[in-house]
Amino acid sequence: MDNEQIARRFYQLAALMEIRGDDPFRLRSYRNAAEAIEVWPTPLKEIAEQEGLAGLQAIPGVGKAIAGKIIELLDRGTFDAWEKLTAETPETVLDLMDLPGIGPKTAATLHQKFKVSSIEDLKKFVAGGGLEMVDGIGARTAEKIKESLDLSGQ
């Protein structure tokens, strides 16, 4: 697992936490760590093998907890916090935010209130006229979402 993949996992973790409405300061700490990891010149795997936790903590934004998660990620390909979070909020919910008009709050509403947790679920929801029931989605946003799902002709 390279630095970019590790950074991507922390960006995803922060996004899932944002969807759940977790503490904004915690989200920011994961995003800051991800930004630093993404551009760090030395592979984190190398640092972890040679210097352990202390070496990883030398990276700006990486404290003891995040360094521990990096080591877990390198050893197992995942970490406990990720497993726990994705058990409650599937990773596929992140795909919803790739669509125009759907940010973290709307993704959270779709998932929590309407049990939409993937693009497939959203297509069925939209085809059944579900967007009109979602607070915060007006006609223009609904149209953007339909167009991006290629459902505007239905």
Residue ranges of model-derived segments:
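Accessory alpha-helical DNA-binding modules that contact the DNA backbone or grooves
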Residues: 33-154
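Charged, compositionally biased N-terminal leader segments and the immediate start
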Residues: 1-22
